[in-house]
Design a protein with these regions (language model features):
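ANL superfamily adenylate-forming
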Residues: 67-109
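Conserved AMP-binding
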Residues: 17-21, 42, 51, 148, ...
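Short hydrophobic alpha-helices that are characteristic scaffold elements of the AMP-binding
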Residues: 28-34, 56, 162, 171-175
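Conserved AMP-binding/adenylate-forming
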Residues: 2-45
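Conserved pre-ATP/AMP-binding loop-to-beta segment of ANL
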Residues: 99-117, 124, 147-153
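Conserved AMP-binding A3 loop
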Residues: 113-137
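Conserved adenylate-forming
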Residues: 47, 55, 78-87, 184-199
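Conserved AMP-binding/adenylation subdomain of ANL enzymes
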Residues: 136-153, 160-199
Length: 199
């Protein structure tokens, strides 16, 4: 509702620049609801890299972690309509004008769902366009690869801005009812041994 009140509707890009947390999927589903487009940004991108993605994608909204927020310039933040703290899901910055309600749009299979930017090993990061049917196909493929269900618990290690982790580490468990745990540190072998003992 809040995004609609600020005129953020179908086709509008909504970026997520954060570590993987339980609120990351909430931001993703908020972004893709009613035809909006999710723009996941790798958590380790520098401020310059993240600002390139925000500008290139023409993102209007940003869900951001505290660590990542500190990397962004004032000029970048002032170009966004809304900035949310991903941990509290509260607006921490609003540059939007008057409230304008946009008509709701139910996403169609071939509508753009996400713009996922590569790490840019041969230059600046480039956006890969993925539709809703791309993600649905990946989730269905997951059931053929390895069936999981409500009694299963998965440990999310890769950043959710990676296509693989987004598809098979978040959307597939969500569709199957499985539980997902997120790590708060780098996945070193010693840390993973401790985490696995508690999952």
């Amino acid at each position: 509702e809040l995004l609609y009140e600020h005129g953020i509707g179908a086709g509008d890009p909504v970026a997520i620049y954060s570590s993987s947390t339980p609120h990351w999927p909430l931001a993703f589903f908020t972004a893709t609801a009613f035809g909006r487009v999710s723009v996941p940004i790798l958590r380790d991108f520098s401020g310059i890299e993240a600002e390139h993605v925000l500008k290139h994608s023409e993102s209007r909204v940003l869900f951001v972690g505290k660590q990542q927020l500190s990397r962004l310039s004032e000029e970048c933040l002032s170009s966004l309509d809304l900035v949310f703290d991903i941990d509290s899901l509260e607006i921490i910055r609003s540059n939007a004008g008057g409230k304008i309600n946009k008509e709701r749009h139910e996403p169609q299979p071939n509508d753009l769902a996400a713009l996922i930017y590569t790490s840019g090993t041969t230059g600046q990061a480039k956006g890969v366009m993925l539709t809703h049917i791309n993600f649905v196909t990946n989730v269905i493929a997951g059931f053929y690869i390895h069936t999981i269900g409500p009694k299963d618990t998965l440990l999310s290690i890769l950043p959710l801005a990676h296509t693989y982790e987004l598809s098979l580490g978040m959307l597939y468990p969500f569709a199957s009812g499985a539980k997902v745990c997120y790590i708060s540190k780098a996945p070193t072998p010693s840390y993973l041994v401790k985490v696995m003992a508690n999952v």
